[in-house]
A protein has these predicted regions:
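N-terminal membrane-targeting/pre-transmembrane regions
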Residues: 1-37
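Phosphoinositide-dependent membrane-docking surfaces
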Residues: 8, 94, 103-120
Length: 158
């Protein structure tokens, strides 16, 4: 199965925000600071007020992180990423082609495939992924078919 699309800034931003939101490390860190805020404020406030303070700490951390991502990703050097892509599920590998290069990633070397609102991500490792936006597919059925084919290749290679 072959899909052609142009990866845009908003696709890249959505991927990064959701990648962080679903990250256990980020969640544990943010929740840890929230618990610390609760604990430090509990000594001089009611439990309810301390809980609200802890929740606000968590929300403020995201309110800082997301604008940081917007700026950081906008000014990054991403011309070889934010371009037209052709991806294909081949028998032995996941194939990606842009005007800058071609890559083959054998199925055994792919870490995981995830489906999130707005995209499918083919993770090569914990920090590198191919992002396929939902708009690249002609229908939700085609997206599901592509995802099922990817998962099938991963399952049979491991």
């Amino acid at each position: 199965m072959r899909i052609e699309y142009e990866l845009k800034y908003w696709d890249y931003l959505l991927f990064n925000v959701l990648h962080q939101l679903y990250s256990a490390t980020v969640q544990i860190t943010y929740l840890g600071f929230s618990v610390l805020s609760f604990y430090l404020s509990y000594s001089y406030q009611s439990a309810c007020a301390a809980a609200i303070y802890g929740l606000l700490t968590y929300l403020v951390m995201w309110a800082v992180q997301i604008p940081f991502n917007v700026i950081y990703l906008y000014f990054g050097k991403n011309r070889s990423l934010l371009t037209r892509h052709i991806v294909e599920i081949q028998d032995e590998a996941f194939y990606d082609e842009t005007r800058f290069g071609r890559s083959y990633h054998y199925w055994a070397g792919i870490a995981k495939v995830v489906s999130r609102p707005g995209f499918i991500a083919v993770y090569l490792n914990a920090n590198a992924a191919h992002i396929i936006p939902a708009r690249a597919f002609s229908s939700p059925a085609q997206r599901q078919s592509f995802l099922t084919a990817l998962e099938g290749k991963l399952f049979t290679s491991n």
